Amino acid sequence: MIVTTTPNIEGKRIVRYCGVIAGEAILGANIFKDLFAGIRDIVGGRSGTYERELEKARAIALEELQQHAVALGANAVVGIDLDYETFGKANGMLMVSVSGTAVVVE
């Protein structure tokens, strides 16, 4: 499946728009506690532990997005947008959300 931030796919023609779809993944407060406990992971101002968790959450959100696209009969998703939001008590949770338009291309 093709998943892209662009509104179209070069060399492909959109033949059907299936609808707007989304995928989400939420990281709980425990990851933030673990990050502070594992401060030794920070190298050059970056936390490998935190980055791995964000990558995992992003992958989950994108996989969910693709599953929704397949359920609608789409073979591509165009115009995707990734967002990161903190919420909950003391912003203790992080949500990764992705949305886009499911399409059929030829």
Swiss-Prot record:
Top-level taxon of the source organism: Bacteria
The record, for SUPFAM superfamilies, names: YbjQ-like
Q: Which InterPro entries match?
A: UPF0145_dom_sf, UPF0145_YbjQ-like
Q: What organism is the protein native to?
A: Vibrio cholerae serotype O1 (strain ATCC 39541 / Classical Ogawa 395 / O395)
Instruction: Fetch the NCBIfam families from UniProt.
Output: PRK02877.1 (NF002776)
What is the name of the protein in this document? UPF0145 protein VC0395_0288/VC395_A0976
Homology family: Belongs to the UPF0145 family.
Q: Which PANTHER family match?
A: UPF0145 PROTEIN YBJQ
